Amino acid sequence: MPVQGSQRRLLGSLNSTPTAPPHLGLAANQTGTRCLEVSIPDGLFLSLGLVSLVENVLVVTAIAKNRNLHSPMYCFICCLALSDLLVSGSNMLETAVILLLEAGALAARAAVVQQLDNVIDVITCSSMLSSLCFLGAIAVDRYISIFYALRYHSIVTLPRARRAVAAIWVASVLFSMLFIAYYDHAAVLLCLVVFFLAMLVLMAVLYIHMLARACQHAQGIARLHKRQCPAHQGFGLKGAATLTILLGIFFLCWGPFFLHLTLIVLCPQHPTCSCIFKNFNLFLALIICNAIIDPLIYAFRSQELRRTLKEVLLCSW
């Protein structure tokens, strides 16, 4: 699998940043650039992947088992869990293969290893893209349920949700294959960065608008009951805190990875950017952390899903 320095993990094409001239390391030393490289032990990487894998398998199983959860909203949540499951699983697979190759326990020709790496890269990239898409789809679904409540069930139907899911998966696979094939083209990397920023803006605008509507609704209820202003202010602060956490986690977990892509285009050979490239494994670990957090935010808050999950766990014993 393509490697560069300590960057040994998925998306080997991304790890193969533009080759620096021979004097780059010397230049970095001359300028006194000090690199802060956060090493991610293989055990920690595998542990994070395993936790995410178990969490998201439970979410998919619970939604599949309970027919009451076969609605458009849970369809998107289930697909988000499946995407996160693939992100974690593919990372665990490549880490395990690398460890086996390094230990000499697995013997394979270079061509076979390269083909395996390409397959894993496509799975990882497509699952990342689909994960971002389903986060956006969940935001749109919630927005429609609030602002078009009376027409929600006629607008967001299960067949339409299934078509949207199919379109997201197909587009994610196609774009990931395109990305892996043309990873060394700046335009492809910039398209991925623009896509991330578009999802971030979409989610921020929709959730802020939903928060504003919720605050207006709470203010109206307070007026009807002749309550004082502090109650409404407390609700607004709580909603703002929730929104900050939701968007903050999204940005902190995904932002560094797309910053990495941006810097590959802008300054592939600059010493400071080279220092950031050394933390590619950390950026992947943050994405896996997001896959761990997603079920806590979008799935496990549902009482119906928690009840089904409890039944599944009890039946398994």
Curated annotation (Swiss-Prot):
A GO molecular function annotation here is: melanocyte-stimulating hormone receptor activity
The glycosylation sites annotated in the UniProt record are N29
- Residue intervals annotated with topology Extracellular: 1-37, 94-118, 184-191, 267-279
Cellular component per GO, a single term? plasma membrane
Residues exposed to the Cytoplasmic side: 64-72, 141-163, 212-240, 301-317
The protein's location, in the record's own words, is:
Cell membrane
Q: Which InterPro entries match?
A: GPCR_Rhodpsn (IPR000276), GPCR_Rhodpsn_7TM (IPR017452), Melcrt_ACTH_rcpt (IPR001671), MSH_rcpt (IPR000761)
Transmembrane ranges, per UniProt, are 38-63, 73-93, 119-140, 164-183, 192-211, 241-266, 280-300
Question: Source organism's superkingdom?
Answer: Eukaryota
SUPFAM superfamilies linked to this entry: Family A G protein-coupled receptor-like
Q: How does it sit in the membrane?
A: Multi-pass membrane protein
Q: Which keywords appear in this protein's UniProt record, sorted alphabetically? A: Cell membrane, G-protein coupled receptor, Glycoprotein, Lipoprotein, Membrane, Palmitate, Receptor, Transducer, Transmembrane, Transmembrane helix
Lipidation positions, renumbered (S-palmitoyl cysteine): C315
Q: Name one GO biological process term.
A: adenylate cyclase-activating G protein-coupled receptor signaling pathway
> Known PROSITE patterns for this protein?
G_PROTEIN_RECEP_F1_1, G_PROTEIN_RECEP_F1_2
Instruction: State the similarity comment.
Output: Belongs to the G-protein coupled receptor 1 family.
Q: How does it assemble?
A: Interacts with MGRN1, but does not undergo MGRN1-mediated ubiquitination; this interaction competes with GNAS-binding and thus inhibits agonist-induced cAMP production. Interacts with OPN3; the interaction results in a decrease in MC1R-mediated cAMP signaling and ultimately a decrease in melanin production in melanocytes.
Relate the protein's function as given in its record. Receptor for MSH (alpha, beta and gamma) and ACTH. The activity of this receptor is mediated by G proteins which activate adenylate cyclase. Mediates melanogenesis, the production of eumelanin (black/brown) and phaeomelanin (red/yellow), via regulation of cAMP signaling in melanocytes.
What protein does this entry describe? Melanocyte-stimulating hormone receptor
